[in-house]
């Protein structure tokens, strides 16, 4: 499977020990399964990366509530659960780093199509801020990484590749570069990090320009985006 092949690739290219486990984070028990796996293997987790996510390729009114609940669990509840489980061991050691992959969308008004995505990412930023407030003085820092459009299989796997295809080339960033910057920022203990200069400027504009303007633009551009699906 994909995880197995990726693990083997890392072993060959970097000469490091790599292990893996397949977990479905829509399952409420998955975070504990992952934690127990690490404890059984006696792995010491000094850096916890929360990177699972996807997008829903349909409008809010057309998406079953069951799917919305799964979405919230993967992007939100599972992150909280994993942090709660692993942070206890970090506190015992007096050190640890947590990376939470958020998004530039956390700073933008909610899209008229991706109704939940932006608000969940905004919550993740605030949650990360809360972790820092409570545990920074005990050697634990949490970094909310807020990338923009990154070239991965995220959009194709989520069924929203047409959205990525319409993004100007200069706004698309390579995943290795974004990942490297994110890891460096997390190890430094940055509380929030926006990769690349392009998206730093975008976030600055999102903070300065009234949200009502972006809401208007979104309402004009978004209708019909997924009508063919």
What role is predicted for each listed range?
Residues 83, 119-120:
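Active-site helix of classical SDR
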Residues 13, 108, 130-140:
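Active-site-adjacent segment of SDR/Rossmann-fold oxidoreductases
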Residues 51-56:
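Conserved NAD(P)H cofactor-binding loop of Rossmann-fold oxidoreductase domains
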Residues 144, 165-202:
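C-terminal helical subdomain
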Residues 21-33, 65:
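The beta1-alpha1 cofactor-binding region of Rossmann-like NAD(H)/NADP(H)-dependent oxidoreductases
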Residues 103:
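Residue(s) in the substrate-gating loop at a strand-loop-helix junction
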Residues 59-61, 67-72:
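Substrate-binding pocket helix/loop in short-chain dehydrogenase/reductase
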